Curated annotation (Swiss-Prot):
Record: residues binding ATP: K14, H208, L209, G210, N211, G212, D283, F284, R285, G331, L332, G333, E334, N335
GO molecular function: acetate kinase activity; ATP binding; magnesium ion binding
Cofactor(s) recorded in Swiss-Prot or TrEMBL: Mg(2+); Mn(2+)
PROSITE patterns xrefs: ACETATE_KINASE_1 (PS01075), ACETATE_KINASE_2 (PS01076)
Positions that bind substrate: R91
Pathway the protein acts in: Metabolic intermediate biosynthesis; acetyl-CoA biosynthesis; acetyl-CoA from acetate: step 1/2
Catalytic residue positions: D148
Descriptive protein name: Acetate kinase
Gene: ackA
Co-factor binding details: Mg(2+). Can also accept Mn(2+).
């Protein structure tokens, strides 16, 4: 069984082709700068050389046609016939309260996705474009939607309600949703395998630390709390996002700086986080290098990030009444020993202790705890694309 996985952004389309008999990746690639001058495709067949094709790509429908051509090409393709694809799995950022799991996409689902656009105006439209392009290029092939928010739909009301008039939840669905759900779900499953215990018997805290970052509390395989909220802006200080802050800062900045609400929103999403704090970069490697050279703002910025992650882990230890393991994943979580060490430094009270030698690992599944740690600390590379393919396969009953 072969499944195509699609992840559409506003000007990009990333894809992978899976052979689900052994979960091997047959090919992967991306089309960048859709609708912008200088668009191109990078295609990488398994065991083959990367192919780059520069071509004007006007929209997502044209981009999807390029993907179809690439994966069926006689020279660098991996399929003899497009009919070998039995399903297309789509990453969808926001499913609102409509979706607590993955679904086969029909007209009702498409209408529901349209109704969620106001909750994710930047992310959901390109996700929808990708689905429409896939349906146009591959009519009759099942399309499966896998939602970043779905995994967190098991959160109880005490975790997702905001302390604002209840009517806004009833009228506008204003609540905490959480994101990175596919990643949190995948690494929790892998952690259970690594620990040799059923997921249903475990209490886990998963830390997805990349340019976007979130922490989740998982009890018996279900999300019970997570750091992101109505949008991905809430929670941790991130690459360019502010994370949680006093909401009155918004009006304060509007008054003091003469800014519009849209300008403040842009600042909080694209000019804040470690970029805004440091004034240097949203790349932690740059910040670590600057801090090592004595840059005080870079050093302070790193400390703010470490501190906020540690605080969320601490709060979720309380929510779960302890945890069996802390899991680090995504770009920073998988590849930065210094981040993992700094985040866990003040958590020894909870039996969380990192072995400095084991912690030097990058991008590999590893238990980095000391032998006497009562709470394990794991590094688990995420694989959201494989999780989407598995969800699609499961829905087709194969």
């Amino acid at each position: 069984m072969k499944i195509l996985v699609i992840n559409c952004g506003s000007s990009s389309l990333k894809y992978q082709v899976f052979n689900m008999e052994n979960e091997d990746v047959l090919a992967k690639g991306a089309i960048e700068r859709i609708g912008i001058e200088g668009s191109f495709l990078k295609h990488e067949p398994a065991g083959g050389e990367e192919v780059k094709i520069e071509k004007d790509v006007t929209d997502h429908k044209a981009a999807f046609k390029m993907v179809v051509d690439a994966i069926t090409d006689e020279g660098h393709g991996v399929l003899k016939d497009l009919k070998e694809i039995e399903a297309v799995g789509h990453r969808v950022v926001h499913g609102g309260e409509e979706f607590s799991g993955s679904v086969i996409i029909d007209d009702d689902v498409m209408n529901a996705l349209e109704s969620c656009i106001n909750l994710a105006p930047l992310h959901n439209p390109p996700n929808i474009y990708g689905i429409e392009a896939s349906k146009a290029n591959m009519p009759g092939v099942p399309q499966v939607g896998v939602f970043d928010t779905a995994f967190h739909q098991t959160m109880p009301k005490k975790a997702y309600l905001y302390g604002i008039p209840y009517e806004y939840y009833e009228k506008h669905s204003v609540r905490r949703y959480g994101f990175h759900g596919t990643s949190h779900k995948y690494v929790a499953s892998r952690a259970a395998d690594m620990l040799g215990k059923p997921l249903e018997d475990l209490k886990l805290i998963t830390c997805h630390l990349g340019n976007g970052a979130s922490v989740a509390a998982i009890n018996k395989g279900e999300s019970v709390d997570t750091s992101m909220g109505l949008t991905p802006l809430e929670g941790l200080v991130m690459g360019t996002r502010s994370g949680s802050m006093d909401p009155s800062i918004i009006k304060f900045l509007m008054d003091k700086e003469g800014l519009s609400i849209d300008e403040v929103d842009n600042i909080l999403n694209k000019k804040s986080g470690v970029l805004g704090l440091s004034g240097l970069s949203n790349d932690f490697r740059d910040l670590e290098e600057a801090a090592a050279e004595g840059n005080e703002r870079a050093e302070n910025t790193l400390e703010v990030f470490y501190y906020t992650v540690s605080k969320y882990i601490g709060s979720y230890l309380a929510a779960l009444n302890g945890a069996d393991a802390i899991i680090f994943t995504a770009g920073l979580g998988e590849n930065s020993p210094s981040v993992r060490e700094a985040v866990t430094e003040n958590l020894s009270y909870a039996g969380i202790k990192v072995d400095k030698d084991k912690n030097q690992v990058r991008g590999k599944e590893t238990d980095i705890s000391t032998d006497d740690a009562s709470t394990r600390v794991l590094v688990v590379p995420t694989n959201e694309e494989l999780m989407i393919a598995r969800e699609a396969k499961g829905l087709l009953g194969k």
